[in-house]
Regions:
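Conserved catalytic cores of phosphodiester-cleaving nucleases, focusing on short active-site segments
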Residues: 102, 107-115
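Nucleic-acid endonuclease domains
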Residues: 1-98, 113-214
Length: 214
């Protein structure tokens, strides 16, 4: 518990989210894999400077990359724990499984957390009311980013009405997220999708949870 409290305190210390600055790639992912075992921002920046100096990288650019990965990983991990706390959810035993985070009523799911996509062709209200359409769009859109798989997914969509660019801060609002996750898990609405890829038809299940801050 103390460890979880520490990482949450450190996540709250981040005042600004730096831009990626470059497309995510295998080399910089490998060089920044220390983010998985680094809890404090002070230790994070110490490792960033160390690796940047050793690999002759620009510290600010590499730092932005590593900070984003650190924040996204640890907020994802903490949000997963909100699911694990519910009696209908069973964690995947292999923490490195690429497409399954947990089982909901026996069905495997991959958790995806993102801001409401600016490229979505409809409004937030439309996506809220037509979650099947939004979920289908997210699958297709993510296929264009090289992250496509046809397994079941549970999407958490974040949106700050007053400042959409600050949606990243909602990833660490664990109290509000716990309420949204708990509400969904009490009576899960699962959407049956039909997807086509390389001449094959896939029918995954999807769920969509919104956290919208006014």
């Amino acid at each position: 518990m103390a460890e979880h409290n520490l990482i949450r305190q450190e996540l709250n210390k981040l005042k600004q989210m730096p831009p990626w600055g470059r497309q995510q790639g295998d080399r910089w992912d490998k060089l920044s894999n220390f983010i998985y075992h680094t809890q404090t921002l002070a230790d994070l920046w110490a490792r960033i400077v160390e690796v940047a100096w050793r690999e002759k990288l620009e510290p600010r650019e590499f730092g932005a990359y590593a900070v984003r990965r650190w924040y996204n990983h640890h907020t994802h991990d903490q949000i997963l724990r909100l699911f694990y706390a519910h009696p209908t959810v069973e964690p995947e035993s292999d923490a490195k499984h690429r497409t399954v985070d947990f089982y909901l009523r026996g069905l495997p799911f991959d958790l995806k957390i993102s801001r409401f996509p600016a490229a979505y062709p409809q409004s937030l209200k439309y996506g809220w009311q037509h979650r099947h359409h939004l979920a289908h769009w997210l699958y297709v859109h993510q296929s264009q980013q090289g992250r496509f798989h046809t397994g079941n997914r549970l999407f958490i969509i974040l949106h700050n009405r007053l400042a959409p660019v600050l949606a990243w801060q909602l990833r660490r609002d664990f109290e509000a997220l716990a309420q949204q996750v708990g509400h969904f898990l009490e009576a899960p609405t699962l959407l049956g999708l039909t997807l086509s890829q390389a001449g094959q038809t896939h029918r995954p299940w999807a769920g969509v949870i919104f956290y919208v801050k006014s």
